[in-house]
Amino acid sequence: MQEYLDLVDSVLSEGAYKPNRTGVDTVSAFSRHYEVDLQEGFPLLTTKQMDGYRWNSLIHEFLWYLSGEEHIRSLREETGIWDAWADDEGRLDTAYGRFWRRFPYPEDGLDGETWPDEDHRWVNEDERTFDQIQYALDQLRENPRSRRIVVNAWHPANAAVSTLPPCHYSFVFNVQGDRLNVHLTQRSGDIALGVPFNVAAYSLLATAIAQRTDFEVGKFAHTVVDSHVYCGKGDRGAWYEENLSALQERLAGVESDEEYRDVKSWLETQTPEGEGYDHVPGLLEQLAREPLDRPEIRVADKPLDELAYEDVELRDYDAHPGISFKVAE
């Protein structure tokens, strides 16, 4: 997917050295935006392998979002990608799906405010929470021209004290003609590991929602406020603080995809040992690879809440070999 490669090049070429809470340093760029036309195929990366166990994790995470669960007790039976942020009983400080499907609203509103009563169709029984996904589905069926079809996973009071508040925190459905588009806003984006999952998950969501509301799928648009590439810790990370400009000078001189490998070779001769958390070499390798044709996705025609792993089928997927990146926690 060329849009992803352009994003990678943009962050590496224009970003600045930036330490952060994880202890793994980054090359960070402000406010990157791109759009992907989903009519041209499903945007699962082909410049590195994303099927197999990666696809398994992606789909089970997506279904977990839709479940509305605030814990990972079922999810961890299929994938361990959330284990680092959960307690021994699988509970999370913040869970995306919990806010998608069960967003809390105050018991005592201020004078003049308007809130739904307990028997409102989007209010969940037995708790004062609001089902944003059902709201979006109903609005798309009944009022598709609405500019208010917003789903939000950011609760300020929760985010202020959470171990890991939502990174991809808000998305908007927007209909143009007969096509359903989705725009995702993300406060923080790990370019090597997180963003490829985000692109695929929200494109899958757009596909599934479009199918259930009788629209053609349109575009996935993505805005990432802090777009970052992890570049290592200790001496490895510190090297980028001193030498990022030299790397960017070489990137500015690249005239063909193959020349990214020359930059990678230069980098590997200059950097100190300890590359485990350095994502830059792997991303340079991806930049040197030609994107292959996008695959197709098929989602079973059944209620959204009844979807299971086997109901999502990836077809005609071919990719370059996998690249391993270590997660910065």
Which residues does each PLM region occupy?
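Terminal, non-catalytic protein-protein interaction segments that mediate quaternary/complex assembly
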Residues: 1-329
